[in-house]
Amino acid sequence: MSKHRASRGKPTVTTTKRQTSPAARKHLKEAERLIAAGQSQAATAQFQRAVDADPTNVDLRYKFGKHLLGQHEQELGILQLERAIRLNDRDAAPLLELGQAYTATNRFAAARGLLEKALEIAGKASQTHLIYGTFLHKQGKLPDAVAHFRKALTLMLECPVEATVPKRKEDFDKPEVERLLWTTLSQLALAGVHAFAAFGTLLGIVREGGLLPFDKDIDLGLPHNELDLAARCLVANGWAEVPHAFAVNPRSFLHLKLQVTIDVTGFAVDQQSGTTYEGIWIEGIPAEWNRLTRWDTISLVKANAPDGSPIWKLEDPEAWLRTLYGDWRTPDPDFDTIIAAKNLCGFSLMTQCYALGRIYARWESGNLRKALAAARHSLRHLPDDELLLEVEQRLSGMTSEPSQRRESAA
């Protein structure tokens, strides 16, 4: 039986370690070297040799499973984690990792038992509550999710993390990705879909003259009632819908050749008020729990891509950007549209889930500046929240920035 005990406020959970056989240790060391050298695919074979040499080692199975999940080998990773748990079902780290993998594939019933056992074993570890909060969030159990995210941050306050300078990926503005954007917009237009460049994609085009180098996906907007037509068009042109999405809006697709993700967001008009709304919403929960943004009438005009093909675009892109970002002309690397959009409809339970989860994740990774920015964005809406005030004060001290109180958003 595991002798794991989570220390007070410990952010992460580790496996119970036992001595690894010399042969397995050799292969594990080589796998870690290959990963450090950016050869993750080659490391897979070394992990396999390691577990073959020491098949009852829980820590090896856990590391191999986690590696496979990181390589998008979902089912193979799950298989290794399941074997680790069969070897020791009281080890919190494999329970949490497998619970996350089940949650990511919407196997909520299977995830529940694992995560509840992890809470029993490692309930004083902040990471346990973060993962359980995410599990609840995906199912639309937002009040309980918020409670666990808050518990994770409360425990994190007891175990501060040092600041790091994270390396930003800055190669999204490749010519082939930009060509893919224009080609996709044209394909959608020809299929009868009124799709337009939106969010970070639009910001890059208008402000920088191209895609933002540190962006991570292509963002398109369209009328909500055209989402299904857009999905059929995208699938017919080399995209595959990302499986196991929990929200009905937006919808995400992966380009199978270029491995680029596109987020397609539906904008809906309230027939009574005439107001346009966009956001992240889940079916079967109260409407006010969802994350929504409010827009004036969105007007599109016909245009042409750089190669002359027909597309749709916003009639007044600068006004659209101003509604979302405020001062969109000044780069702000810490701006997070999900929680800081200027046109948010309040600070709903879902928005709180994203805000609390992102504060935690950035803090845990050592990106304290972004964690602090997320805390301050949250305080604009919840200025008297004692936990957020304490988090903001702690992060301010850790980043040598003066603590500040933000006035409530209008």
Please give the residue ranges for each predicted region.
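Short coil turns that delineate tetratricopeptide repeat
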Residues: 21, 55, 89, 123, ...
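Structural signature of tandem alpha-helical TPR/SEL1-like repeats
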Residues: 35-46, 70-83, 105-117, 139-148
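Helical scaffold of the NTase/Pol beta-like nucleotidyltransferase catalytic core
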Residues: 104, 124-130, 134, 138-197
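Conserved catalytic core of two-metal-ion nucleotidyltransferases
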Residues: 173-185, 189, 235-314, 335-363, ...
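Active-site nucleotide-donor binding segment shared across nucleotidyl transfer reactions
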Residues: 185-218
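Catalytic metal-binding acidic patch
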Residues: 209-230, 308
